[in-house]
Design a protein with these regions (language model features):
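Hydrophobic beta-strand segment of the Class I
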Residues: 28, 124-125
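A short acidic, Gly/Pro-enriched loop at the edge of an enzyme's catalytic core
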Residues: 112-123
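Class I SAM-dependent methyltransferase SAM/SAH-binding core
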Residues: 58-113
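A short glycine-rich, Lys/Arg-flanked "PGG" loop and its adjoining helix->strand segment in the class I
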Residues: 137-152
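Core SAM-dependent methyltransferase catalytic element
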Residues: 209, 216-239
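Conserved alpha-helix/loop element of class I SAM-dependent methyltransferases that forms part
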Residues: 27-30, 36-57
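N-terminal auxiliary segments of SAM/dcSAM-dependent transferases
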Residues: 1-19
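C-terminal alpha-helical "lid/dimerization" subdomain adjacent to the S-adenosyl-L-methionine
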Residues: 16, 156-211, 215, 221
């Protein structure tokens, strides 16, 4: 089945994404560096700085992967839960956490059906998460549900540039680079071609901002990163 067809429905995308991230988990940290032009850690630190974590803040990091954002929030004094749908990602995050005291607590969970109580967090973060869910509105609803009134959400993700020329060049670059890395690391050129395919179906930064507003957030803003190839969204749950 062609990649485009495999992710054409919510059910198909959910199955494909779960299988994909289980496959790439052990190389996830490496691939995020390679596909972000070496800027991944800088972008995540920028998101963390915008979140203004503090002692006693309750935070949840969604699509936590191996825990980069979660660990940074915890270092600033926040009480952090890291959630990821991929069991292997959580195993890797927990392996890192064993060397720390007072670090995040990690658990397996789905962004569209979080195993967390409502109105229980001051902050929700997501790195490369919203673009991968099978139902974006459901994920935004879950973020809204678990936040306290007045709580903040931040999301870092790939963006679909508004310029048709830049968009075409960007997607072509990701497609070729993804194919090469997929073959070198997994002997499967389609492994990282999922990224440009998912961007084509993503509403883009402005579209995500409109969805956040429609689902009950205010003070919605987004910051273009790297000429708009990436974006960081910030929004507040209405008081």
């Amino acid at each position: 089945m062609a990649l485009r067809d495999a992710i054409a429905t919510p059910e198909g995308k959910q199955t494909y994404v779960r299988r994909l991230f289980a496959t790439i988990a052990d190389r996830y940290d490496l691939i995020t560096v390679l596909l972000s032009y070496g800027q991944d850690r800088r972008w995540k630190q920028r998101l963390v700085a915008m979140a203004s974590p503090r002692q006693g803040m309750r935070a949840v990091d969604l699509a936590t992967g191996t825990g980069d954002i979660a660990f940074s929030l915890a270092e600033a004094g926040a009480s952090v839960v890291g959630v990821d749908v991929t069991h292997r990602m959580i195993e890797l995050a927990n392996a890192k956490a064993r060397h720390l005291s007072g670090g995040p607590f990690f658990l397996v969970g789905d962004m569209i059906a979080l195993p967390l109580a409502g109105d229980s967090f001051d902050l929700v973060t997501a790195g490369y998460g919203l673009r991968n869910v099978p139902d974006l509105r459901a994920a935004i609803d879950e973020i809204h549900r678990v936040l306290h009134a007045g709580g903040t959400m931040l999301s870092l993700d790939f963006n679909r540039p508004e310029s048709p020329i830049l968009r075409a060049v960007y997607l072509a670059y990701l497609n070729v680079t993804g194919a090469v890395l997929g073959w070198l690391l997994h002997r499967d050129p389609d492994t990282y071609r999922y990224i440009p395919a998912s961007i084509r179906n993503y509403p883009g930064a402005a579209g995500v901002a409109r969805m956040l507003e429609a689902q009950g957030f205010d003070r919605v803003e987004y910051t273009p990163v790297l000429l708009g190839l990436m974006a960081i969204h910030i929004a507040r749950k209405k008081s």
